Amino acid sequence: MPTSIKKSRNEFDKSPRRYRGSSGDQRRNERYEQLLSAGLSVIGSQGYAAASVRSICAEAGLTERYFYESFANREALLAEVYKTQTRFLKDRMLAAFEKSERNSAAFSRAGLQAFFDTLHQNPDVARLLLFEILGVSDTIDLLYYEAMEEFAVLIRTLTESLDLADISGIPNQDMIYAGLVGAVLQIARRWALTNYREPVSSVVESGLFLFSAATNYTANNTP
């Protein structure tokens, strides 16, 4: 066989195989996204404890072998679904911050509005972020606390960089921002447990009170 033909055949054999116009990597990515979506749906409607690999695969329309192609176990899926949805929430908040007026009240209101709107409009996301992520394992607990710390750092960074509020007189500012994030989450949990009885505007005002109180405390206690 001529060398040129051998070379062409070898190059062809090394190229990604395609099926119905998609490469193997593309199909794996599609299955991965299907499983993430199915995981959110099943966990959001049934709870993590009841979310079996079989039920997630049934929701995704895939066999179990494809589940283990992407995830080692249910907990690994939970972690990826959680990280995906925290990014989704953070992106919604950042977009709101970008559009808000550059003052402390408007900035806080915009972020809180985006946060509570997202939970209200996406009950599966709310159940995952507020309840189902808790108490699963030490590894998942660490993931949860890391995410909460990231939100606290985000708010502090944006607040300071835009000079929206000055709480420099408080000895441990990190504690304050972490506390604000935790308090807003608890408001959200209570709201969800009452089946979102209060209107979004009312819940936003409750959260805004906490941020205003932190700012006012510093203003009133600065020499």
Predicted regions and their residues:
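Short, amphipathic alpha-helix enriched in basic
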Residues: S22, R28-S55
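Amphipathic alpha-helical packing segments from all-alpha helical-bundle domains
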Residues: R87, D91, D138-L164, D174-Q186, ...
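Hydrophobic alpha-helical connector segments
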Residues: E80, A95-Q121
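Helix-turn-helix
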Residues: V42-A76, E80
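Hydrophobic/aromatic-rich alpha-helical bundle segments in the mid-to-C-terminal region
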Residues: L130, L162-L210, T218-P223
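N-terminal intrinsically disordered/low-complexity leader segments
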Residues: M1-E30, D166, A219-P223
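Amphipathic alpha-helical segments used for helix-helix packing
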Residues: Q121-T139, R156-T159, R189
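Alpha-helical DNA-contacting segments of helix-turn-helix folds
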Residues: Q26-E30, F71, A76-Q85, R92, ...
